[in-house]
Amino acid sequence: MTPLDAKRPLQLNHQGQLRHFLSLDGLPRELLTEILDTADSFLEVGARAVKKVPLLRGKTVCNVFFENSTRTRTTFELAAQRLSADVITLNVSTSSTSKGETLFDTLRNLEAMAADMFVVRHADSGAAHFIAEHVCPDVAIINGGDGRHAHPTQGMLDMLTIRRHKGGFENLSVAIVGDILHSRVARSNMLALQALGCPDIRVIGPKTLLPVGVEQYGVKVYTDLNEGLKDVDVVIMLRLQRERMTGGLLPSEGEFYRLFGLTTARLAAAKPDAIVMHPGPINRGVEIESAVADGAHSVILNQVTYGIAIRMAVLSMAMSGQNAQRQFEQENAQ
């Protein structure tokens, strides 16, 4: 457990309900299952003629993205809109932060505008924790990705994808392949799989892209792709995060693809009904072959659909938990 994750109780209210969603570390299996079950119930909303439910009517959700994102930002916007919330998306590149305003001041000003929830994506690990503890403790904070640390909603949408396509976790072998070192998605997935009872979690990559001590997540480590993929049920590919790399961690992208790129031939080592996942954006010909990304084993587009439902679940649960905590504190202050 990292110092950041030692603050896990910050995420829960006095009844153990979600009030912030910052990391998956330490969250009980029952709560993760509740998120998955709630998301399952929201999937049918997307199939309606009117894709809305009134759970967050009258509430304001602010998406504050200090890092670029298309998929995550758009699905959070859709999730909030389908819950009937008012949605504000802050373009940080054109905001006051580019004029020297601090993260603290930006969020406090938004809070003064009566925002009820912030979805925050930031390049610094721990940014969402800092905001939840020191800046806006009375506003529900959702971590949309912070540095290398965590991407909890991506982790949960991946778990929903696995559960819907494989039925559960108890008998599965799951391989996470690629740039594990720089991936907040990998960390969130390892934590979620462990909490949900997956017995065989594998990480596969070159030694230079594997974190020191990764075994603490209860995983088996492989540096040979063919060996690591043998008889797995699920393959989660990760992109090379060149923007976070320093030094000569890789000879070239071509060399990485030769050794660790997922091709049709390499996928044959997995089980015949294995599914292939990717959090996006995909680098075709770097970590995955187009024939695999677009093939029968791929559930990559399903992940996007499930992402909306997971984010609806998290937004609605965190808002409910924060409201309950606020009421509890008001009653006990009297």
Curated annotation (Swiss-Prot):
Pathway: Pyrimidine metabolism; UMP biosynthesis via de novo pathway; (S)-dihydroorotate from bicarbonate: step 2/3
Positions contributing to carbamoyl phosphate binding: 71-72, 121, 151, 154, 280-281
Keyword Transferase recorded: yes
EC number: 2.1.3.2
UniProt binding sites for L-aspartate: 99, 184, 239
Keywords: Pyrimidine biosynthesis, Transferase
Leader peptide range in chain numbering: none
The keyword Transferase is assigned to this record: yes
Single Gene Ontology BP annotation: 'de novo' UMP biosynthetic process
Disulfide bond entries: none
Protein name: Aspartate carbamoyltransferase catalytic subunit
Native organism taxonomy: Bacteria, Pseudomonadati, Pseudomonadota, Gammaproteobacteria, Pseudomonadales
Gene that this sequence comes from: pyrB
